[in-house]
Every structure is written in C-alpha cells, then in structure tokens.
C-alpha cells in the first residue's frame, strides 16, 4: 500500500462503506487498516500473514536509526519518533499482529497493490523488509542481508500461499489485486532503472493474471493499465514522470466506483468532511521507497 489503496479507501469512506480499521494510528488516524506501514511485495505480504498466525518469527526485532532511536524493521516509518529501546519495539509487536489477524478474519474484501519484485531479505531466515538495511535504520550486522529480484513464479507462489492461508481462516474473504503504476525510484541491479521497472511491472502483472485465472475469489482491477497505457500519452504522471497526477487518480477511481460500487443497496454516501480531511492529511505519509530520495 502506498498511494492506490489510500485513494480506494477514501472513496469507500466517501460512499459510506466500512473501511475496516483494527489498529488506529495516533489520534485515531486510519491511514492503514492495521499499522503495518507500506507493503510492496507479495513475499512481504505473505510473511506478515504467516507472522500473525504464528507460522513465522523473524530473528530481526529492532534496527537502530542514526539518532539512536529504534525502529521495527518491518514497518520502519510507522512511528515517526521511533522507539526508545529494543524492548519497546518488541512490546509493540503482539498487539499489532493481533490486529492484523483480526483484519484478515473480519474483512469481507481485501484490496492489495503489488508494487515491487525487488526485495531485501535476511540470509538467516529469509525475512523480507520494505526498505534496504541502512536507508532508514541499520541492523546489528548489515552483512546478513541480500538483494533478490523475484521471478514471476515466485510472486505467483507467494500470492497463492497467502490466499490459501487467509481464506483458511476466513473462507468468505474476497481479494482484489492491483499493480502499482509508479515506476521504481532506483534499482540495485546493474542496469538502468527503466529496464528494472519494465521487468518488475511485467512480472507482477503476469503473476497477478495467473492468480486471478485460478482463484475464483480473486479479481484484478486495472489501475496500472489506466495510468500507464499509451492512449493517454503520459498525461497521468506529474512532471517528475513518476508521481501519479490527480487527474489519473480521478480516472482510476471513476472506473473503480463504476464497476465495484454499483449496488442497489449500498450505504448512503457519508458527508463527514472532517473524516475525509483527516484521511487526506494522513495520506501524505512518506512512502518507504521514497526514503531512498532523502539521502541524495
């Protein structure tokens, strides 16, 4: 989740649907359903589900920021001020995972945007992180991590395992997948970032397509195609050719509403201006990947 899912959530709120929040942020902020931060890869999503059901316990608990504060390496920017100690990071984890578990078990529809095939993982236990070690904080031993660029088969397998796991606990759960149209800001591979972006988006789109063909409870929403298709000549990107313009977001949400919210018994649109304003304010949170730009 980084930009697409927030706009979908805001549209659902505006139309009176229940955007299910199991772990509110400070001041009641509902930017994330639970406070997991941005999730970019299928592997990261799968591991979060496995962790909340006690199937995986990574050895990494806390990393250290340059200012001496500590962060949860799996959601490094969820607490802007960081934590005072490693123990504080560990103590915040059980209630968080319980909230994630409730999210999976109490939801009717789960919407997820896959954004990256490039991941950083621990060589000790395979744990995957949203940003590379050192971008936001440093682990005790930086040599125990490696870069991996996932294949179509690996993304497909991770998504399939995730779907099987969460629907085992919530058989009625439906899943809507999208692919992020936002290009990579950088790549660790020895090739141009344009090549890396083309591979990543192609692999994700192919994997998601195969998943949807084999899972009746899963659908695909083409926000990627709407934003990046040649027919609009790049008009849906800002001047940096990376950020999605408001006109593109509006087009995506019109299509989403037309095809997914058109029901005769849907709740009346909520006229809660304060709620919409708070969601818009909270949505300005820095994406983890954009932290790569802050050090340049």
Q: What are the roles of these predicted feature ranges?
A:
Residues 1-3:
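Short, small-residue-biased leader/transition segments that mark boundaries at the very start
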Residues 8-15:
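Short active-site loop/helix that positions an aromatic residue
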Residues 15-40:
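Active-site-surrounding "flap" and adjacent substrate/cofactor-binding loops of secreted or lumenal enzymes
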Residues 35, 42-50, 252:
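Short, Φ-rich (hydrophobic/aromatic) sequence segments
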Residues 73-296:
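Alpha-helical cap/lid subdomain in secreted, periplasmic
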């Amino acid at each position: 989740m980084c930009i697409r899912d927030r706009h979908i959530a805001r549209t659902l709120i505006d139309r009176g649907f229940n955007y299910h929040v199991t772990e509110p942020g400070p001041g009641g902020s509902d930017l994330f359903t639970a406070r997991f931060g941005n999730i970019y890869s299928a592997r990261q999503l799968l591991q979060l589900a496995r962790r909340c059901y006690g199937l995986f316990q990574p050895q990494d608990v806390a990393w250290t920021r340059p200012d001496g504060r500590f962060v949860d390496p799996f959601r490094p920017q969820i607490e802007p001020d960081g934590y005072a100690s490693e123990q504080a990071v560990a103590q915040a984890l059980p209630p968080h995972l319980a909230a994630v578990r409730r999210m999976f078990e109490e939801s009717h529809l789960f919407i997820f945007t896959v954004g990256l095939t490039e991941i950083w993982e621990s060589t000790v236990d395979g744990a995957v992180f949203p940003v590379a070690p050192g971008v936001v904080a440093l682990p005790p031993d930086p040599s125990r991590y490696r870069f991996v660029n996932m294949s179509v088969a690996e993304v497909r397998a991770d998504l399939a395992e995730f779907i099987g796991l969460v629907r085992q606990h919530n058989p009625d759960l439906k899943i809507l997948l999208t692919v992020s149209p936002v290009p990579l800001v950088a790549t660790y591979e020895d090739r141009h970032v344009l090549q890396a972006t083309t591979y990543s988006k192609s692999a994700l789109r192919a994997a998601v397509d195969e998943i949807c063909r084999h899972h009746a409870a899963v659908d695909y929403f083409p926000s990627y195609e709407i934003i990046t298709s040649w027919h609009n000549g790049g008009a849906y990107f800002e001047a940096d050719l990376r950020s999605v313009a408001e006109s593109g977001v509006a087009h995506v949400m019109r299509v989403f509403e037309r095809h997914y919210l058109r029901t005769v018994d849907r709740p009346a649109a909520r006229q809660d201006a304060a709620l919409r304003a708070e969601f818009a304010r909270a949505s300005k949170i820095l994406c983890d990947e954009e932290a790569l730009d802050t050090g340049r």
